[in-house]
């Protein structure tokens, strides 16, 4: 038997078992990371997520941490390989049993599995690096597109950038959650492998104790008579008791590890459910963001269409305004011409009234002239009669001239009285007694001055 106990060998080979305080701190840390992930996702859904640069820096930090852990695990595995090789050499020198070599082979296989897990972890880090480079390239392309789009349409570009930033942030959060999930899976597998190895070693130790006890009983039967072997028997009994105690301790450790494994499995299931919920939420948020982007695109197209229609309507409105101005000018011209026409009509009506008055005056003057002509005709007729009477009187005077010379003076008066009796008034006196009036101003002229009356009538009619 080795001077070192099986517990010390297990601890030296697999490292000390994590205490309950460390598991509690890891659990609290995991809960805090889940709460931070939830708050960051809530901030993303509410439009308050961080920028894409912060997400990239965070992913780089995660990758650096994973690389550091990978290097640490590589160093740890190298140390474990050295320890395993040392144990192989020690066991080869101490024991020649094939079962121990088989156990060591199993341990080496487990180490190879851990190495494969480490390689898979490194591959995952490389994949994450490639994804990071692809996402950075895509983000640069989207930023260039967004900058070109921002020159034409600022508001849709801002919405697009914010939505892309939120989508990128959600992708980063999801990648972080997947990385943590993968780490927990690796840790769970390692713990399960450790528990299986520990159980196998405990089973092997039980077999070894049984075989050692059987061999000891046989040896004790063979060398009961020998007294110097009593000390060895006590020594082996003491070692057997110690091995049983260590076995009991390891059994308790196994039960504790099983409980912790069940607890971590439960936590892993909860975390997996939360990750699934977050994936569903992220997918729904992506659909909503895509729908918002489509709606923003439709809104921008509609705004552009409305702008074009408004420009067309503005052109038509300008044309209608020019036409209305032209029509107003034409209406003003027509109104002015209408006013002039009305004035001309008023003047024409006034002239017509004046013409009617003139025609009426002319008719009146014509009637007056006809009356005057009739009066002149009557006067001329009377003048002719007066002239004929004068000629008759002169002829009678000449005829009676002789008788007047022969008779005395009284006889001469008798014919005059007779003449006066025969012609009570002379023609000149009759003409002087007749008066003629102007038809317009009613000025009276004697019949003897009829020529002056004609001149006055012509002057008065002008």
From Swiss-Prot:
Residues 157-235 are annotated as: Interaction with TSG101. The modification Phosphoserine is found at residues 96, 99, 423, 426, 428, 434. It comes from Mus musculus (Mouse). The keyword Phosphoprotein applies. There is a hierachy of phosphorylation, where both Ser-423 and Ser-426 are phosphorylated at the onset of mitosis, prior to Ser-434. Phosphorylation at Ser-423 and Ser-426 is required for dissociation from the centrosome at the G2/M boundary. Phosphorylation at the 3 sites, Ser-423, Ser-426 and Ser-434, is required for protein function at the final stages of cell division to complete cytokinesis successfully. One of its GO terms (molecular function) is identical protein binding. The lineage of its organism: Eukaryota, Metazoa, Chordata, Craniata, Vertebrata. Keywords: Cell cycle, Cell division, Coiled coil, Cytoplasm, Cytoskeleton, Mitosis, Phosphoprotein. Residues 1-26, 410-430 are annotated as: Disordered. Its main location: cytoplasm. Residues 160-214 are annotated as: Interaction with PDCD6IP. This is Centrosomal protein of 55 kDa.
């Amino acid at each position: 038997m080795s001077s070192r106990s099986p517990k010390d060998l297990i601890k030296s080979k697999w490292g000390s078992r994590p205490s309950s305080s460390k598991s509690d701190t890891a659990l609290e840390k995991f809960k805090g990371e889940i709460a931070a992930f939830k708050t960051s996702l809530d901030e993303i859904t509410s439009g308050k997520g961080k920028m894409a640069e912060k997400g990239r820096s965070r992913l780089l930090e995660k990758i650096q941490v994973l690389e550091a852990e990978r290097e640490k695990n590589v160093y740890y595995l190298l140390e474990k390989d050295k320890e395993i090789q040392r144990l192989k050499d020690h066991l080869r020198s101490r024991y020649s049993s094939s079962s121990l070599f088989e156990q060591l082979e199993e341990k080496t296989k487990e180490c190879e599995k851990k190495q494969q897990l480490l390689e898979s972890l490194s591959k995952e880090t490389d994949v994450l690096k490639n994804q990071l480079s692809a996402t950075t390239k895509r983000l640069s392309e989207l930023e260039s597109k967004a900058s070109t789009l921002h020159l034409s349409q600022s508001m849709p570009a801002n919405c697009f950038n914010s939505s892309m930033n939120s989508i990128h942030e959600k992708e980063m959060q999801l990648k972080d959650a997947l990385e943590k999930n993968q780490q927990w899976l690796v840790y769970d597998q390692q713990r399960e492998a450790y528990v299986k190895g520990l159980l196998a070693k405990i089973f092997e130790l039980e077999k070894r104790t049984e075989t050692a006890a059987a061999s000891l009983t046989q040896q004790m039967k063979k060398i009961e008579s020998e007294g110097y072997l009593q000390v060895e028997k006590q020594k082996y009994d003491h070692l057997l008791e110690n091995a049983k105690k260590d076995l009991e301790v390891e059994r308790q450790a196994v039960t504790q590890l099983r409980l912790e494994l069940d607890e971590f499995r439960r936590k892993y299931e909860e975390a997996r459910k939360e990750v699934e919920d977050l994936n569903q939420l992220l997918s729904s948020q992506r659909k909503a963001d895509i729908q918002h982007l489509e709606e923003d695109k439709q809104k921008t197209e509609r705004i552009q269409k409305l702008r074009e229609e408004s420009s067309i309507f503005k052109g038509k409105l300008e044309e209608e305004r020019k036409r209305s101005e032209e029509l107003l000018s034409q209406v003003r011209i027509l109104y002015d011409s209408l006013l002039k026409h009305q004035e001309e009509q008023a003047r024409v009506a006034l002239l017509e009234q004046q013409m009617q008055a003139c025609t009426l005056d002319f008719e009146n003057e014509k009637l007056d002239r006809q009356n005057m002509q009739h009066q002149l005709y009557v006067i001329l007729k009377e003048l002719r009669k007066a002239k004929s009477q004068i000629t008759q009187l002169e002829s009678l005077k000449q005829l009676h001239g002789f008788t007047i010379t022969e008779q005395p003076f009284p006889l001469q008066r008798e014919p005059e009285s007779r003449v006066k009796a025969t012609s009570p008034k002379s023609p000149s006196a009759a003409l002087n007694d007749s008066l003629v009036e102007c038809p317009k101003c009613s000025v009276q002229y004697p019949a003897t001055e009829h020529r002056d009356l004609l001149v006055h009538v012509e002057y008065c009619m002008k």
